[in-house]
Amino acid sequence: EKVTETSVIFRFVHLSFGVYLPAQEYTMISAMVMIGLQPYDYTKRIDRDFDKARHLGYHLTLSWGGKHDDCIFDVAERYGLNVAAPVYGVKKSKPVPDTIKAPNGEEYETIDGDVTDWRRDDGWTGRSRIVALRLKRTPGQTERLAKAFCIA
């Protein structure tokens, strides 16, 4: 359903976020909100319309640790996405490895995902990369569960 910007919506967005919305009809609310914003997110779902997300300026990073881990890198490569994944045994004071061998047998360059959560600046190098996240332990987490959760 199409959304028409109204003065109430305009005022709210302008006062809350400092974003000016041109008065026009929008195809969806998300298209209206994305003017002046740079939305990004992580997703485990591989059935998203990644082409439409890119067209709308909605930056997505795939997340390791779901039921689609067996094909997540195929999807990442097809759509030019990176994959965020926890790594085991890397202390906060140590750098993440330069590359990680994924379960598909391929070696991928890494980005230190703990430096910032802002994935939009990661850029595209022509190949997917692993956004390496140091494992944050949770109460009751066994070594076996921790290792199973991590990509490497």
Language-model region placement:
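Class I S-adenosyl-L-methionine
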Residues: 1-152
